[in-house]
Amino acid sequence: MQRLGGILLCTLLAAAVPTAPAPSPTVTWTPAEPGPALNYPQEEATLNEMFREVEELMEDTQHKLRSAVEEMEAEEAAAKTSSEVNLASLPPNYHNETSTETRVGNNTVHVHQEVHKITNNQSGQVVFSETVITSVGDEEGKRSHECIIDEDCGPTRYCQFSSFKYTCQPCRDQQMLCTRDSECCGDQLCAWGHCTQKATKGGNGTICDNQRDCQPGLCCAFQRGLLFPVCTPLPVEGELCHDPTSQLLDLITWELEPEGALDRCPCASGLLCQPHSHSLVYMCKPAFVGSHDHSEESQLPREAPDEYEDVGFIGEVRQELEDLERSLAQEMAFEGPAPVESLGGEEEI
């Protein structure tokens, strides 16, 4: 029996051994089939995603156009409502305020109307005023304005007004276009219309509102290509300058009333703004004609106006008057002897 059991065990083992490598042929060739079969669904999914993105973009554009049309319809409806007020039917003294909310599409239109009528019993004069404020909100009835001032948007964003809405926009990096300092990220300033890291407040090209905002040697003036005034260096010899129709008045206004931006800056110290070649263009020229060396010494560097600040205001006015008188005398000398004699008579007086 033991021998028979051993024979049966050997037979079973011999039958089981060849069955082990049997699955190997299926493993070697089966991966070749699913490859192309798996690629088609992936390509189809990619195309579906592209079509879905295009559809979403078209829907978003249609939604924006629909919202714009609804806002225009709301404004027209508010205008019609205000025009329906009959002044004659109102009592002599009338005051009324109404606030209404109307659903227009997916938006809520808020209309606040104030009507006031006052009649003077003695003169019979009637004063009528009407104020209509219209705003459009979203589906939840909230106002579309996201912010009012820059501080409402946080440190890395600023408040921008566009398309009749105030929204928070991300700050702009270095060398990007700007119109305000708050549009630039971090400690950057808007200089010459671009966000700049190295700019200092009141420095060359920084935004200004009046002359006090600029550092010495600079003046607040408008520049071509910019919609706002910037701190500009005082022009030197040969550069365009502020029209000196009344040089003394300009000097006093700039020294005593440093408010408001100019179209062009006045000349640096030692220079006069004079017409160039009998034209309407004014350029900075030396104050003492024929003394070129003296004018070069008296020219004020753009960034170092220390000598200009040390001179007192009275002395500066006196110097401007003397320079103006000398310049007029030399210009009149070319016209004939009569003007020279009359000018000499004035000097003797």
From Swiss-Prot:
Gene3D superfamilies: Lipase, subunit A (2.10.80.10). Highest expression in brain, eye and heart. Keywords: Coiled coil, Developmental protein, Disulfide bond, Glycoprotein, Secreted, Signal, Wnt signaling pathway. It is found in: Secreted. Residues 208-284 are annotated as: DKK-type Cys-2. GO terms for cellular component: extracellular region; extracellular space. Glycans are attached at residues 96, 106, 121, 204. Residues 1-22 form the signal peptide. Transmembrane segments: none annotated. Antagonizes canonical Wnt signaling by inhibiting LRP5/6 interaction with Wnt and by forming a ternary complex with the transmembrane protein KREMEN that promotes internalization of LRP5/6. DKKs play an important role in vertebrate development, where they locally inhibit Wnt regulated processes such as antero-posterior axial patterning, limb development, somitogenesis and eye formation. In the adult, Dkks are implicated in bone formation and bone disease, cancer and Alzheimer disease. The C-terminal cysteine-rich domain mediates interaction with LRP5 and LRP6. Interacts with LRP5 and LRP6. Belongs to the dickkopf family. This is Dickkopf-related protein 3.
